[in-house]
Amino acid sequence: MARAASTLAAGVAQRARGVTTYAGRLESLYQANLLSRQDLQRSYGGAYLSFFTFFERSIEDLFLGLVMGRLTCSTATRSLVEIRSEVVARRLVAGGRNYADWLPFEQHTVKRAPAFLSGGRPFTDVPGNDRHALQRAHYIRNALAHESNHSLKQFQRHVIGQQFVPPHERRPAAYLRGAHAVGQSRMEFLLAELVFVFDRMCK
């Protein structure tokens, strides 16, 4: 029997809470002079990358679950193919590659969805603001993972942009640790944003 896709969304929310709790413990160690600022910022970067990997895998799980009829959404979704084997499904979705990319969302997930799901729903129904949030998350991921001139320029242009960010917070990991609002780091805000986006995707 198919289960509600909202169970996947609950898993993403739980992972985000775990990352936020982890960051709070790191801050306590830093305040107690048991962790250097450099190590603290590196830990923020690692925590974000870990969550991003889990998030992208959750998009894959949602996609395959809907295609194979294992998951249901309240949004009208209908698989265009009948596949019982997950191995076969993964091969078809990957299109001959060893694995399938899901982000950038527009480039991979939205482009792939109409071949497997009627109208590409729910992925083609993701609104513009949510797609922007997913793209921004990917820019941050690339800047942290690659630290190349190109990825850092993309980060500066598309993530920092015109907003005021103190000079010492203009690198990716330091940016994540910086304050989005009183009592909330940028990483905490960004994870909450992705949780919201994925929850809407699953409805």
Model-derived regions, located:
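Charged alpha-helical initiation segments
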Residues: 1-53
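Short, helix-capping/interhelical loops that line the mouth of catalytic, cofactor-
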Residues: 1, 82-90, 162-174
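Helix-loop junctions and short alpha-helical segments
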Residues: 40-140, 153
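Charge-enriched, short contiguous segments at helix-coil
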Residues: 31-34, 38, 113-195, 202-203
